[in-house]
Amino acid sequence: IAKYPSGILFAGVNAFFAGINEYVREGSAFVFRANSLPEGNPTDPMVLLGTFAFGVLPTVIFFASLMSILYYLGLMQLLIRGMAWVMQKTLGTSGPESMAAAANVLVGHTEAPLVIRPYVEKMTRSELNALMVGGFATISGSLMAIFVFYGISAGHLLTASIISAPAALVIAKVLQPETETPKEVDAVSMAPEQIATNIIEAAAIGASDGVKLAINITGMLIAFLALLALLNAMVMGLGELTQYFINLGRSGNDVDLHWSMNNLFSMLFYPLAWIMGIESGDCAIAGELLGKKVVVNEFIAYSEMGEIMDGKVLDASGNVVTMTDRTRVIMTYALCGFSNFGAIGIQIGGIGPLAPERRSDLAQLGLRAMFGGMLAACMTACMAGVMYGW
């Protein structure tokens, strides 16, 4: 996907997202226009559109509306059915779990189960696990625009989401092998539910859903960034207190502790980064990004990765943190997924109403499925590292 033919797909995907950003700026500039204010004023459209809230979140709204239109026209269903058919025939998975895995490539982990709504109640535990792992291992198309804003390659993001879908099915079957008899359903014959009655209503429904998603993202980022800062301050304070008692009564050679959440994440996930093939010099920062992705969410991880790529992150000594291009590519794949602790509750809350009597199964599978999604993303990252430079 990345190399054939000569990177045309990557260039096309990157150009597509760049074009979308330009179209969104037209609508955003009109909404946030302030004609009576001088150029360069903080409320000037061009200044506002450089911020996350006014420059990126409108892209989510537009993309959600566009996806809804494509869904109404039947193009989304055609693409999802095609991918589901390939996975069902090559991997031997059931129709519902193949269909959900294919849908996860394009939509979110709470929207994908709606594609197989009539079948969720009768799914086996192995199929339920596959449904959840697939959601944790991929990202939605609407969120790709946000990560592109951070400087992440749209081509790599799309490739990561595509190859993580079958990888998620493989990991899911390893974690929860099929011991029951799944209901025989052909993925191609499954008809996703159609809501809109015309293309205008489809655009309106998509825009409305996009607004809800944008507001949710805004609140989540504000809360999680504030909580992360609070936790970091607590860890640093504990480190300073520990350092004081260790050095109490010592003469010279004082212990200098640099405790922080970043250092904690780095130490915990350093081995995983090394196993993925990241060179030792980048394992510390890669482990930190993996930790933030799992403990907090992928937004924070990609945001910091973008700042590292721009040379805006400094280490404890005041030196600019860097990473090699190969590490950047591997981490793009490793971070591409909803596998974090908060997403467990979101996914259970999204799938639960479709099959209330399966809530206990969903709760039991939640943590395992989240780690399965993380492993699937890391597995695709390993493949990206192997293929890098070919």
Question: Language-model segments: what does each one mean?
Answer:
Residues 38-48, 87-88, 112-121, 193-211:
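Cytosolic juxtamembrane amphipathic/interface segments immediately preceding
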Residues 208-317:
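Transmembrane helical segments that form the transport core of multi-pass membrane transport proteins
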Residues 1-53, 201-204, 221-227, 350, ...:
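N-terminal alpha-helical transmembrane segments of multi-pass membrane transport
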Residues 1, 60-69, 138-146, 161-176, ...:
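Hydrophobic core segments of alpha-helical transmembrane domains in multi-pass membrane transport
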Residues 80-115, 182-202, 244-251, 261-267, ...:
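Juxtamembrane inter-helical linkers in multi-pass membrane proteins
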Residues 35-67, 312-336:
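Individual transmembrane alpha-helix segments
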Residues 162-215:
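Long, contiguous bundles of hydrophobic transmembrane helices that form the permeation core
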Residues 88-147, 287-371, 375-383:
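Alpha-helical membrane segments and immediately flanking helix-loop junctions
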